[in-house]
Swiss-Prot record:
Coiled coil: none annotated. GO terms for cellular component: cytoplasm. Keywords: GTP-binding, Hydrolase, Metal-binding, Nucleotide-binding, One-carbon metabolism, Zinc. This is GTP cyclohydrolase 1. It comes from Nitrosospira multiformis (strain ATCC 25196 / NCIMB 11849 / C 71). The gene is folE.
Length: 191
């Protein structure tokens, strides 16, 4: 799995370590290039995943359900495209179905699909919402992401603990104040 023209691999990580003044052959670093190569393959696996395949609907008797479906506290782990620094937090997803529902775990898988790419939080939020709208064709979609960004916490302003909140409201959640209020209440509920 060595480096070639199209893949950043073990040899590249060894060169990076040498450029930092490290010896890639020393005890603590010997296996680091291989581990980091595998880690980045994992952290960017979303490029090889298809949201349409994740959001296949199924018939289980829930097709007549016509109230909001909300899943909260979906873990988000991604890397910013500007510094390759991690950002992480939680997502809340809600949608108002029109006969097409998916297993609840599919919402987590969808977040993981888009988060496992180089991202900005704003685009990640929109990609999740647009994908749900396109593949499930619901009356409404709401997505809220709350994340901490290591590019802010470990460099630059270097303030720990700040949280960035982004949202995307589509369909009735964008135009219907009552629906939007219900989604936001369910998203914030601690009961």
């Amino acid at each position: 799995m060595d480096s070639n023209d199209s893949e950043f691999g073990i040899g590249d990580w060894q060169r990076l370590l040498r450029s930092l003044g490290e010896d890639p052959s020393r005890q603590g670093l010997r296996e680091t290039p291989e581990r980091v190569t595998r880690a980045w393959a994992h952290w960017t696996r979303g490029y090889k995943q298809d949201p349409a395949a994740i959001l296949k609907t199924f018939a289980d008797g829930g097709e007549s359900y016509d109230e909001l479906i909300v899943v909260r506290q979906i873990p988000v782990y991604s890397h910013c495209e500007h510094h390759l620094a991690p950002f992480f937090g939680h997502a809340t997803i809600g949608y108002l179905p029109t006969g097409h529902i998916v297993g609840l775990s599919k919402l987590t898988r969808l977040v993981n699909c888009f988060a496992a790419r180089l991202q900005v939080q704003e685009r990640l939020t929109q990609q999740v919402a647009q994908s749900l709208l396109e593949h499930l064709q619901p009356k409404a979609v709401g997505v809220i992401l709350r994340c901490r960004h290591m590019c802010m916490e470990s460099r630059g302003i270097a303030v720990a603990g700040e949280e960035t909140v982004t949202s995307a409201m589509l369909g009735d959640l964008k135009t219907n104040a009552a629906q939007r209020a219900e989604f936001l209440a369910l998203a914030e509920s601690h009961e």
